[in-house]
């Protein structure tokens, strides 16, 4: 705008000179007034060299710097929100002359990196360059029609769900629904998911998702062990289970000291009396459909629990496992409208009986009531979980796959029971038509057993047939040299079946078509296995079958939930930073979304190139030598990292090294993961400054020198401080024969400033859903890849179907086993982290760490006169997060962290992390992506709440009946005919002036947690039952 104004003035002067020659040419040459500031031009009198005459009056030399010609759509300035001017002002407010002086005072010099430089993308790609690069990678992936099956299927993702959930930041930037009052939308959707699972499996309890089918089966195996109180130590897996599931269970069994036996069903032997459980597949991995009724009766007669891995689409027409007698049912909801994505993310499930509900892993959504007596939803039975029970938890799982569970639930809502049955019958019909056609051809032999969607074929040369299919861009599953399976799905067409006939004809003419023989095909499902029980009878599954209706339902639920679209979510240790649109775009491109994880790797060269680049970049960032991308959650990464350490000790003959030292301040997943590895846990305390007590650690390490396996440590600490003694801590562990496992939860304060490898760690998992921008999705997906030093690289996990290992690959390989169902975990979301790292460049990503630290210190400074800041470093600064101490307020005003969090909802904010790592506190993490204005708004809200608390302390307002205890205040409460509160409706609703311009409203009053657990309901209830319960509690 300014440049245009100056050029216009220059034009007017030229025009005036034409009419008034008395104006001198030197008047036109005053750069300070009329020439663009982009020009280095200097003009003085008649000494100007004239390269070009301007209308005969004077002359001007204009040059443009090369810098000015570079693309302008750079990314770091879009991600890192504080401007250079704001950075200086904020640093000065904290007490430092500039940002770098603050960083120098905060990060210990002993571990500080001089600099970090990428080997690729060091300057950072612009957003348009990044999109072009990802399009180039996508072009290297080949999309073949998949008939591989094995738990992964093509699916038609309804576009209304794709656009309005998977691509919608209103859904994918939400956090796990800890604050139920501003999460009722996704809680309802997850309750829909649980209801869908319980209806289809025929069992009354389901969780709200697990990571994948293989790990869900391993969790079920652990449940069987717990149900039997650890007294029976053998678990039998039927050979008809998916190979990846078998390997995951074998790997997981080591930590529980379980013996896993793989056997044909006919050879199962319970005579030892030592079998805690069995796992079977329904339908089997090669398609066979068996009636397990008598098998299950026999298992139960021998005191053995039965786990059944099943397929949701098949269960729409097959007798449900619960009716067959199964105790636990697991599986994947992937084929309910979630792309294969080269392996994930997908929502798995686990269903069981009421009897075992408290042994279930994962999050469970339950129905409760709010303070007004109206029905409300919440996460139920949280006392089972790792953040409370630590090493005694049912599982280490926390982040699961909520976003994908929501997609699958909406798929069920959209199609309804009749729509799902139609899809299942069509898939079964296509498989039946294919089988009939092969019998008619006579070139191969078709299995005699009944099937649902997968046909098993015996042939002379399976490789030759697979190669013929390859020519038609079709992938088949080669079981062995004489066996092929062909799995059908909802995207298969009748034309595909005709093409398959040509493939299997082996040169013989095909004299019929699929359409011509289809009328002759009979149902292949035995009458005893045909489903008769109705399912999805609740109105929600029977009223949103047009796109308009589903769109409005999705939008209605979204409007109930606070996300990053509305305000910052300052949860400590959660790193709720920007999930940029450019990062998210490739996730839904078909070239990334529609590849089967077991497709030949030559069909996924774009993925493979990205994996290599990402592995190299993560090695640079962390100081490690190799990475595994297989762990598909942070907790899975912890488990994998500890198992790598155990494999290393075992390879050296140190089988006895099983002691793991963990600070009391560690996240609950740390002891839970160590327990899953069969480790003996020893805790060490912290000193008054929140640092690990080094002398106590030294004594513990020396006392267990012969048996020490590892230390688990988070850096910066969970107290939000860079511990000065971290290098000494690592040395103590190494001197006593142990390895250092670093929890990567706080990596956002390390990148570019220090690194786990530089500090002295041997292995570390990265939460890509924290530091590296994968969105939290309302409770998943996540990714937890692990980086290791060279000596641990040979032990990184592999896979039974597609062998994998470290990136870069080590010289030798002795993999520990299999951690996740897919070779590269949730590969579909890796482009998010990859694009973030590549666009930021080494300097931009380093600045992100610096600004995250600046923002935290700025907020701590603003709040310190109102709330005590619990821990600081040696120079009085905090890391990227800090802890506000509310403990004194319980005595002076009866206020606890939950009360402050609920009142923050009235101000339009999600509360910080409550009562962890210190009970009675709030932990705040702003991230680098929040603007100074947003930081100030949040600080203003907390300061205003402190003033409200002061009114309680002074006795001005009632100790128990006040605006904080009454929070949050939803519209229905504020608009009620009767108002009995001792404060005004206006003050309850609008405690800050900015709220009148825009306010996010909670949709329920404070939810009663105790009622929900005492009256556990985890599925949709008939509407009238909700009304009756509300009346009963009113």
Swiss-Prot record:
EC nos: 1.4.4.2
Q: Return the InterPro entries for the record.
A: GcvP (IPR003437), GDC-P_C (IPR049316), GDC-P_N (IPR049315), GDC_P (IPR020581), PyrdxlP-dep_Trfase (IPR015424), PyrdxlP-dep_Trfase_major (IPR015421), PyrdxlP-dep_Trfase_small (IPR015422)
Q: Which GO terms describe its molecular function?
A: glycine binding; glycine dehydrogenase (decarboxylating) activity; pyridoxal phosphate binding
Q: Which GO terms describe its biological process?
A: glycine decarboxylation via glycine cleavage system
Q: What class of enzyme is it?
A: oxidoreductase
Which residues are modified to N6-(pyridoxal phosphate)lysine? Answer: 770
Give the location in the cell.
Mitochondrion
Question: Has UniProt tagged this entry with the keyword Mitochondrion?
Answer: yes
Q: Which reaction does it catalyse?
A: N(6)-[(R)-lipoyl]-L-lysyl-[glycine-cleavage complex H protein] + glycine + H(+) = N(6)-[(R)-S(8)-aminomethyldihydrolipoyl]-L-lysyl-[glycine-cleavage complex H protein] + CO2
Per its UniProt record, what NCBIfam families does this chain match?
Answer: gcvP, PRK04366.1
Family per UniProt?
Belongs to the GcvP family.
Spell out the subunit comment: Homodimer. The glycine cleavage system is composed of four proteins: P, T, L and H.
PANTHER family in the record: GLYCINE CLEAVAGE SYSTEM P PROTEIN, GLYCINE DEHYDROGENASE, DECARBOXYLATING
Function noted in UniProt: The glycine cleavage system catalyzes the degradation of glycine. The P protein binds the alpha-amino group of glycine through its pyridoxal phosphate cofactor; CO(2) is released and the remaining methylamine moiety is then transferred to the lipoamide cofactor of the H protein.
Protein name as it appears in the record: Glycine dehydrogenase (decarboxylating), mitochondrial
């Amino acid at each position: 705008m300014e440049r245009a104004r100056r050029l216009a003035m220059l034009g007017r002067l030229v025009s005036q000179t034409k009419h008034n020659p008395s104006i001198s040419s030197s008047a036109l040459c005053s750069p300070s007034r009329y020439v663009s500031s982009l020009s280095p031009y200097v003009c003085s009198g008649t000494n100007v060299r004239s390269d070009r005459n301007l209308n005969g009056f004077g002359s001007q030399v204009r040059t443009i710097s090369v810098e000015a010609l570079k693309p302008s759509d750079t990314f770091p300035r879009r991600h890192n929100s504080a401007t250079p001017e704001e950075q200086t002002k904020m640093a000065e407010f904290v007490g430092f002359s500039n940002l770098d002086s603050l960083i120098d005072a905060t990060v210990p010099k002993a571990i500080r990196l001089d600099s970090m430089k990428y080997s690729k993308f060091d300057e950072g790609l612009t957003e348009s360059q990044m999109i072009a690069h990802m399009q180039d990678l996508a072009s290297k992936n080949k999309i073949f029609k998949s008939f591989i099956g094995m738990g992964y299927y093509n699916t038609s993702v309804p576009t209304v769900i794709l656009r309005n959930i998977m691509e919608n930041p209103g859904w994918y930037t939400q956090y796990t629904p800890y604050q139920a009052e501003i999460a009722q939308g996704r809680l309802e959707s997850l309750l829909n998911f649980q209801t869908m699972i319980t209806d289809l499996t025929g069992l009354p309890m389901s969780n709200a998702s697990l990571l994948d089918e293989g790990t869900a089966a391993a969790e079920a195996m652990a449940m069987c062990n717990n149900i039997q109180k650890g007294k029976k130590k053998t678990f039998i897996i039927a050979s008809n289970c998916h190979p990846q599931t078998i390997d995951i269970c074998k790997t997981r069994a080591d930590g529980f000291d379980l013996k896993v036996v793989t056997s044909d069903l006919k050879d199962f032997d319970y005579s030892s009396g030592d079998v805690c459980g069995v796992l079977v597949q329904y339908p089997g991995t090669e398609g066979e459909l068996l009636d397990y009724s008598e098998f299950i009766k026999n298992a139960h007669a021998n005191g053995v629990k039965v786990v059944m891995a099943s397929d949701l689409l098949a269960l729409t027409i097959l007798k449900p496992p619960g009716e067959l007698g199964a105790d636990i049912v697991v599986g994947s909801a992937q084929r309910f409208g979630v792309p294969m994505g080269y392996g994930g993310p997908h929502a798995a499930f686990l269903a069981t009986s009421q009897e075992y509900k408290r042994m279930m892993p994962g999050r469970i959504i339950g129905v409760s009531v709010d303070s007004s007596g109206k029905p409300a939803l919440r996460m139920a039975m949280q006392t089972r979980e790792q953040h409370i029970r630590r090493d005694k938890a049912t599982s280490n799982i926390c982040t699961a796959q909520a976003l994908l569970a929501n997609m699958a639930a909406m798929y069920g809502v959209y199609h309804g029971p009749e729509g799902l049955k139609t899809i299942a019958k069509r898939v079964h019909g296509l498989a039946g038509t294919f089988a009939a056609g092969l019998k008619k051809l006579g070139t191969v032999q078709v299995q005699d057993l009944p099937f649902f969607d997968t046909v098993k074929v015996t042939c002379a040369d399976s490789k030759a047939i697979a190669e013929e299919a390859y020519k038609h861009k079709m992938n088949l599953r080669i079981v062995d040299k004489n066996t092929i399976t062909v799995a059908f799905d909802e995207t298969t067409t009748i034309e595909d079946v005709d093409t398959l006939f040509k493939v299997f004809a082996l040169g013989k003419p095909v004299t019929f078509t699929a359409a011509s023989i289809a009328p002759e095909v009979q149902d292949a499902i035995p009458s005893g296995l045909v489903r008769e029980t109705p399912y999805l009878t609740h109105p929600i599954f029977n009223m949103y079958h047009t796109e308009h209706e589903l769109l409005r339902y999705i939008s209605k639920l979204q409007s109930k939930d606070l996300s990053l679209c509305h305000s910052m979510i300052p949860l400590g240790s959660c790193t709720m930073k920007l999930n940029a649109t450019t990062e998210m775009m490739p996730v839904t491109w078909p070239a990334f979304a529609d590849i089967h994880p077991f497709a030949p790797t030559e069909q996924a060269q774009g993925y493979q190139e990205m994996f290599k680049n990402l592995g190299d970049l993560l090695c640079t960032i962390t100081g490690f030598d190799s990475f595994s991308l297989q762990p598909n959650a942070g907790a899975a990464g912890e488990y994998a990292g500890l198992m790598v350490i155990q494999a290393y000790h075992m390879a050296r003959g140190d089988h006895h090294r099983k002691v793991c030292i963990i600070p009391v301040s560690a996240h609950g997943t740390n002891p839970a993961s160590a327990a899953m590895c069969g480790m003996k846990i020893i805790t060490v305390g912290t000193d008054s400054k929140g640092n690990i007590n080094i002398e106590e650690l030294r004594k513990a390490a020396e006392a267990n020198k012969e048996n020490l396996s590892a230390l688990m440590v988070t850096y910066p600490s969970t107290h939000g401080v860079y511990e000065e003694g971290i290098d000494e801590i690592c040395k103590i562990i190494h001197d006593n024969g142990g390895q250092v496992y670093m929890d990567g939860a706080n990596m956002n304060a390390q990148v570019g400033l220090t690194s786990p490898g530089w500090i002295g760690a041997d292995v570390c998992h990265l939460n890509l859903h924290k530091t590296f921008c994968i969105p939290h999705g309302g409770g998943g997906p996540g990714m937890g890849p692990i980086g290791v030093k060279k000596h641990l690289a040979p032990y990184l996990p592999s896979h039974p179907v597609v062998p994998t290992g470290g990136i870069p690959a080590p010289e030798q390989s002795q993999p520990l086993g299999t951690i996740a169902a897919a070779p590269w975990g949730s590969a579909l979301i890796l482009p998010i982290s990859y694009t973030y790292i590549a666009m930021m460049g080494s300097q931009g990503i380093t600045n992100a760490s610096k600004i995250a630290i600046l923002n935290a210190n700025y907020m701590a400074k603003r709040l310190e006169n109102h709330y005590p800041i619990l821990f600081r470093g040696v120079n009085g600064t905090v890391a990227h997060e800090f802890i506000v101490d509310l403990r004194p307020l319980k005595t002076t005003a009866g206020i606890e962290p939950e009360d402050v969090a609920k009142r923050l909802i009235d101000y339009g904010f999600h509360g910080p992390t409550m009562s962890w790592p210190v009970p009675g506190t709030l932990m705040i993490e702003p991230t680098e992506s929040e603007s100074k204005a947003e930081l100030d708004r949040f600080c203003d809200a907390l300061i205003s709440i402190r003033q409200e608390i002061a009114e309680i302390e002074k006795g001005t307002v009632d100790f128990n009946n006040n605006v904080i205890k009454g929070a949050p205040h939803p519209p229905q409460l504020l608009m009620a005919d009767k108002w009995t509160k001792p404060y005004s409706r206006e003050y309850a609703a609008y405690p800050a002036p900015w709220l009148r311009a825009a306010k996010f409203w909670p949709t329920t009053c404070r939810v009663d947690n105790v009622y929900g657990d005492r009256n556990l309901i985890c599925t949709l209830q008939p509407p009238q039952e909700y009304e009756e319960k509300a009346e009963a509690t009113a």
